[in-house]
A protein has these predicted regions:
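Catalytic core of pol beta-like nucleotidyltransferases
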Residues: 1-26, 34-41, 50-96
Length: 96
């Protein structure tokens, strides 16, 4: 349970950073951190964000992963997401 609380805290901090620094317009948490019944000790934080300039994406990934050395953040630019991933996000995602 503490790991889930930590993961969600990282997700919220990452969303704040992405909005303030990279001008993200929409950020959605998906995957096991958004679905507590699927969460386990090896879960990471899956985020999809729109509005991040593609030239700043690598820096954004580094910054969100620097928030917590124990918790990996998988960041996807919404503009580059596959239709299949977008369907998963629409079904199980939670806006931040």
């Amino acid at each position: 349970m503490r790991h889930l609380t930590r993961a969600r805290g990282v997700a919220v901090a990452a969303a704040s950073l992405l909005r303030a620094t990279y001008h993200a317009t929409e950020i959605i948490l998906f995957g096991s951190t958004a679905q507590p019944e699927r969460f386990h000790e090896r879960s990471d934080v899956d985020l999809i964000a729109w509005g991040i300039d593609e030239r700043a994406y690598v820096r954004a990934v580094a910054d969100v992963n620097g928030l917590d050395s124990y918790m990996f953040v998988d960041l996807v630019r919404g503009e580059e997401a596959s239709p299949r991933l977008l369907a998963v996000v629409a079904e199980e995602g939670s806006a931040l």
